[in-house]
From Swiss-Prot:
It comes from Blochmanniella pennsylvanica (strain BPEN). InterPro entries: OMP_Chaperone_SurA (IPR050280), PPIase_dom_sf (IPR046357), PPIase_PpiC (IPR000297), PPIase_SurA (IPR023034), SurA_N (IPR015391), Trigger_fact/SurA_dom_sf (IPR027304). Residues 1-20 form the signal peptide. It is an enzyme of class 5 (isomerase). This is Chaperone SurA. It catalyses: [protein]-peptidylproline (omega=180) = [protein]-peptidylproline (omega=0). The keyword Ribosomal protein does not apply. Chaperone involved in the correct folding and assembly of outer membrane proteins. Recognizes specific patterns of aromatic residues and the orientation of their side chains, which are found more frequently in integral outer membrane proteins. May act in both early periplasmic and late outer membrane-associated steps of protein maturation. The lineage of its organism: Bacteria, Pseudomonadati, Pseudomonadota, Gammaproteobacteria, Enterobacterales.
Amino acid sequence: MKFWKIFILIFTLKTNIVLGALKTVDKIVALVNHNIILDSDIRHNIYMIQDNILNGNDNILQDISHYQKILDQLIIDNLIFQISDQQKINIDHTQLNQMINCILNLYDMTFDKFRAYLYDIGLNYEKFYFQQYQHMLKKQICDHVMHDRAHILTNEINKIVKKSNIIDINKQFKLRHITFSLPIQPTPSQIDRIEYFARLLIKKKEFNNNIKELIRTYSNKNIIQIIKVHETEWVSWKDIPIIFDKYLQTINKGDVIGPIISCDGIHIVEIQDIRYKQIMLPVTKVTAKIFGIQNSCENISIVEQLLQIKENMEKSNTAFNMMIKEKSKDICFNHYEENTICKDLDDFEPSIRKALSSLKSNEISIPVHTSCGWRLIQLIDISILEYNEIMYERAYLYLLNNKFDEIMKNWIQELRSESYIKIIN
């Protein structure tokens, strides 16, 4: 009888321990207004920013300071997303799909292979898609805050213009521009980790010139979400951010600049080619939205459909991508492109340049035949710039970049002070 009493006591204790463990698998660690943050949210983020965390590196999970930093970032994210809900700010899914297509191209994956890869690292595609949506949403909100709150004085701009080097506006570059995006208010360890990877790529490039292959070889589960590789056409020195000026003075073809840290991430720039092209001042700067169907040169019916889209847009003031959703059953419209481009009028190909010259602000062209197929073109903005205005514009953007951290810090402090935030131990 005594044996059974002891057995029942032990069984009860074991059961309570197991049930207690089950109850504490997840828990609420913070309240942010009407939202909650779970312990599992923090652990998932730690997993996504550490290497081989499941291979015996469990002490990271116990690092209180690291845990606290991730919690702080999630609190900031919650505050920002609550603003997007209140103001009904959304992201165009066309941009997001284009970004994911760039990732597929970078890693040389089909869509199915990409889904399988995400599954192997503990993510499903829907969760990944939502994470990228949130990232783009945060960036858009922060950009709005920057432009609303940035107060840059004329004397500040004058100081930068006086200090800056004289640029050769006739010098143009073909660039491979690699951007490693950073979270809002990144921790020093996040910056160090990405900067280390950027330096590794530059070092390995001495032995392998294929940068995309190097990224695929040396990146891991975290990097896939934060690298963008953009290969430019000819771009004038005046259109390259001022943070690169000191390097562009003496740069040669094949040289690599970076890593350089700015408000929108860490940058590496590879100089693929250099040329000189006479630019006549003043410069006509154009911002335009160009929309069309890939490989549509031979398909005459697309011209009629693009004309119909133009007419519908002008009548209903509907965006390009919304019109395309209505035509998604047509196989031709499975591969549409939409890009907002800002560059000199002279840098557009002749057919686009001719169309832009005839448009008024926000007016949409008739279908234009280009080297890439048929396109609709919408003029967003046009401005005439002399050399001094070009230098002032570059200085303004440079100061905007420098003030980013301070403006974001003050704004987030205001959000915190106006919100109910409770940390639950």
